[in-house]
């Protein structure tokens, strides 16, 4: 991956590097299933792409200091969709027979992959970089919570 402009925001990076991120997601997801067919992998990728799009949307939402504080205490984002791609993902993982632990591991792997791919392009850690990481973590945590909630109701 080539070096990006040092001012590249994390949400922009996710949008422009979806292919690399999805390859990482696919590699990890394949370790969770034995004998996964190509159709199933394409379904996995579709939901992963939708989750990435929702993460970016969440990260780009303007937030007041009060909204930031409320989110840090577990309140959902005001812009959060009632039925998210992460909800669907949790349901599909339940029907696939994936364990609760494996579901959580997917989001852990997604978080690590995105940050591992993005951070080498950031020569200096600035306040904005840290804020981007916080927003990303909040968005990932909210997506994980959606997946878990749907998984648990089954």
Q: What residue ranges belong to the model's regions?
A:
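N-terminal accessory segment detector
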Residues: 1-39, 46, 50
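Hydrophobic transmembrane alpha-helices and their membrane-interface boundaries in multi-pass
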Residues: 24, 34-91
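Amphipathic alpha-helical segments in well-ordered regions
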Residues: 28, 47-58, 62, 113-117, ...
């Amino acid at each position: 991956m080539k070096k990006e402009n040092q001012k590249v925001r994390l949400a922009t990076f996710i949008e422009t590097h979806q292919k690399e991120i999805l390859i990482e997601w696919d590699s990890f997801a394949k370790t969770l299933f034995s004998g996964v067919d190509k159709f199933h992998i394409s379904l996995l990728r579709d939901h992963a792409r939708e989750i990435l799009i929702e993460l970016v949307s969440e990260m780009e939402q303007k937030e007041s200091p009060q909204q930031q504080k409320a989110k840090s205490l577990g309140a959902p984002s005001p812009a959060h969709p009632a039925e998210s791609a992460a909800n669907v993902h949790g349901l599909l993982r339940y029907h696939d027979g994936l364990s609760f632990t494996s579901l959580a591991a997917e989001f852990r792997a997604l978080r690590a992959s995105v940050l591992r791919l993005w951070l080498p392009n950031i020569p200096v850690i600035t306040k904005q970089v840290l804020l981007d990481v916080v927003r990303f973590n909040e968005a990932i945590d909210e997506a994980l919570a959606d997946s878990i909630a749907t998984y648990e109701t089954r």
